[in-house]
A protein has these predicted regions:
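Active-site-adjacent core segments of small-molecule enzymes
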Residues: 2-513
């Protein structure tokens, strides 16, 4: 096709005047289709700066994918306060009548960028609130617990869930080897292997902050808090066979579902509630309330409604607004703080550090990550990609006598808690109900109905049947027996039946040959 005919086609398809193609520096270019060559069949000229620019830019279009939660999607929205929790926190975002712009990202945990959305996995559920006091992020999942309780194990856990370094293949043996040697994982693995591991869509699943956080009210009183996001579309799951079919037919099934729903005006929403624990209760509660592998019973700490979170706008550019988005549990606002949760402590460091590596030193200046309703005043400067800077006469150090920003000493004690003891490496002191398997057993026996239990048994049998080391298989049977004795016995019988069927199939195949 000639340049002229291509121009006519463009003219017909655009409503406004045709804009000339330019280089990155704004100068017009001669052709989008032909390199500068010595004759029509000759070599390309190195001084064809537009060719060089296009190829160089193309080579750099991708940034490192997230080491976890790589595959995902998201949208913009609004959070509206419908309840009154001002007695517990002074955070502006949670005051009655407040409306706050938000960004949400959903994701899977273990899969890479191109992995199918419907693989069995925990789903990420992260919300950024652009509050008048700065950005506040809740970086959670669609389950209220996690696989481990100490961040020092996180790299090992993720390695075990991804791929073998030799073959580059995912491996059931190393997954179950890690899980069964880390019994604190039992509660989360029960969620994962149950129906919660295969939601129908991101719209039809709940979300949780998972960690315990601290709220501080206007009087300085402290409380411990957990976040819950209940889907107003209901919680809907899919069968394993259906998930496998969809994985082969549409790897972007969840991403497409969310985009199409919002595009059609079918805005998904979640009712946001919290559990509140009085500060002093944590010292004597029957299990460690900061343990990320445990839930707080609603009978002890009932849900209190805070507001409604609605997604109502798709990104205009997926890369700029979703892929470059950086969420961090370190992003607190006045009235909200951390807790002694060891996993939370590790994530407070690792998330912004990952963003600096993945997006760049000045990732927080990008529009999607910068505050939308609060000013930024600090003394940071320079670094790759720096866009914003202070006035030339402004000081770049503190303290100064030139009218630069001044820290607020009244915030110094906010978010604190009392602790003592020697510096050591050890697990938390066990309390009366600090069992790794107790809540997993309760979930299986009291929450799963008979049909869900049957599906669960089939799922773990299939997953464990791929284990190649007998000692890991035996340990997996012990693991589930510790969750529930009846379940463990059924699993052993199921595995024996599956193994016998495999042997018969193998013998039949050999006989046929």
């Amino acid at each position: 096709m000639t340049t002229e005919s291509n121009s006519e086609s463009n003219s017909e398809s655009n409503t406004g005047p045709i804009k000339p193609t330019t280089t990155q520096t704004g100068t017009p270019v001669a052709s989008d289709e032909h390199s500068l060559t010595v004759g029509t069949d000759g070599v390309a000229a190195l001084h064809d700066r537009y060719l060089v620019e296009k190829l160089a830019q193309f080579n750099r279009e991708r940034i490192p994918e997230r080491i976890v939660h790589a595959k995902g999607g998201g949208a913009h929205g609004v959070f509206e306060v419908t309840g009154d929790v001002s007695a517990y926190t002074r955070a502006a975002v949670f005051q009655p009548g407040t409306s706050t712009e938000t960004l949400q990202r959903f994701s899977s945990v273990a899969g890479e960028q191109g992995s199918p959305d419907t693989w069995r996995d925990v789903r990420g559920f992260s919300v950024k609130f652009y509050t008048t006091e700065g950005n506040y992020d809740i970086v959670g999942n669609n389950t209220p617990v996690f696989f481990i309780r100490d961040g020092i194990k996180f790299p090992d856990f993720i390695h075990s869930q991804k791929r073998l370094p030799g073959s580059g293949l995912r491996d059931a043996t190393m997954q179950w080897d890690f899980w069964t040697l880390s019994p604190e994982s039992a509660h989360q693995v029960t969620y994962l292997m149950g129906d919660r591991g295969l939601p129908r869509s991101w719209r039809e699943m709940p979300g949780f902050g998972s960690h315990t956080y601290q709220w501080i009210n206007a009087a300085g009183e402290r409380f411990w808090v957990k976040y819950h996001f209940a889907s107003n579309q209901g919680n809907v799951e899919m069968e394993g066979s259906e998930a496998e079919l969809i994985a082969g037919a549409d790897a972007d099934y969840y991403r497409r579902d969310l985009h199409d729903a919002i595009e059609a005006g079918n805005f998904p929403s979640w009712t946001v509630s919290v559990q509140i624990m009085p500060y002093e209760d944590a010292k004597t509660y029957r299990f460690n309330p900061f343990d990320l592998t445990k839930v707080w019973p609603h009978a002890d700490y009932p849900l209190i409604e805070v507001g409604v979170h609605t997604l109502n706008r798709n990104p205009q550019n997926f890369f700029a607004e979703i892929e470059q988005a950086a969420f961090s549990p370190a992003n607190f606002v006045p009235g909200i703080a951390a807790s002694p949760d060891k996993m939370l402590m590790a994530r407070i460091f690792s998330y912004p550090d990952a963003a600096r590596y993945r997006v760049g030193t000045n990732y927080a200046e990008l529009p999607v990550n910068a505050p939308h309703a609060a000013p930024v005043n600090n003394y940071s400067q320079d670094g790759a990609g720096r866009h914003h800077f202070n006035a030339p006469e402004a000081p770049n150090y503190a303290p100064n006598s030139l009218g630069g920003p001044v820290a607020d000493p009244l915030l110094a004690g906010e978010g604190s808690w009392e602790n003592d003891g020697e510096l050591l490496r050890a697990a938390a002191v066990l309390r009366s109900e600090d069992s790794d398997f107790g809540q997993a057993g309760t979930l299986y026996r009291d929450v799963f109905d008979d049909a869900a239990k049957a599906r669960f048994l089939d799922t773990i049998t299939g997953a464990i049947s791929g284990v190649q080391r007998p000692e890991v298989t035996e340990r997996a049977i012990w693991y589930w027996t510790s969750v529930d004795a009846t379940l463990g016995a059924a699993l052993r019988a199921n595995l024996a039946t599956w193994a016998e069927a495999d042997m018969l199939a193998e013998a039949s195949a050999q006989y046929s040959e």
